[in-house]
């Protein structure tokens, strides 16, 4: 089984009942950042880009791309601190974030660059013209839910610290069985 192989590789497994894996990762990454540790999160999940900072980077194994703060801007058109707003507008089917129909990545990045934040976009929604403006106004009530779903919690109570999760020595015997 996979879990036994992971343990045999010297990788600590951490499971928290009733807690999203993203929230566990976010909590550990922010604790590591606070402790001055560099963190690399291997994922192609867009919502993890909100965690990127001077010590937290993402590695997308599918594209082979490493994302630091500048890489997030290059890929999504907004800095990491605007990724929650970007995801709220664009949505993400893999994380069940509905977003606003007809608002794609470029439109969301344009609005966030122009208005500065989701709150400012909402406050000035009547100024946004065309069909996409109509869609935004028609979906204003669902934005708080999308925002909540897009936000990775970084305050989950965990009994492990980042230092406890250092890579261990592989169990060669277990791996060759």
Regions found by a protein language model. Give the residues of each.
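Extended two-metal-dependent nuclease catalytic cores across DNA- and RNA-processing enzymes
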Residues: 1-159
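Long, highly charged low-complexity segments
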Residues: 161, 172-177
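A glycine-rich phosphate-binding loop feature that marks nucleotide/adenosyl-phosphate handling sites
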Residues: 164-169
């Amino acid at each position: 089984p996979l879990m036994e192989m992971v343990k045999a590789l010297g990788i600590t497994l951490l499971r928290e009942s009733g807690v999203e894996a993203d929230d566990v990762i976010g909590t550990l990454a922010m604790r590591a950042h606070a402790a001055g540790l560099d963190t690399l999160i291997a994922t192609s999940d867009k919502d993890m880009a909100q965690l990127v900072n001077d010590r937290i980077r993402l590695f997308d194994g599918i594209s082979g791309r490493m994302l630091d703060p500048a890489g997030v801007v290059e890929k999504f058109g907004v800095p990491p601190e605007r990724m929650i707003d970007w995801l709220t507008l664009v949505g993400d089917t893999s994380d069940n974030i509905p977003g606003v129909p007809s608002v794609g990545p470029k439109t969301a990045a344009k609005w966030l660059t122009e208005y500065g934040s989701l709150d400012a976009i909402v406050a000035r929604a009547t100024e946004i013209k065309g069909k996409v403006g109509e869609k935004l106004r028609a979906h204003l009530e669902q934005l708080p839910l999308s925002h909540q779903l897009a936000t990775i919690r970084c305050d989950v109570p965990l009994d492990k610290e980042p230092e406890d999760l250092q890579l261990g020595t592989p169990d060669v015997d277990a791996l060759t069985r």
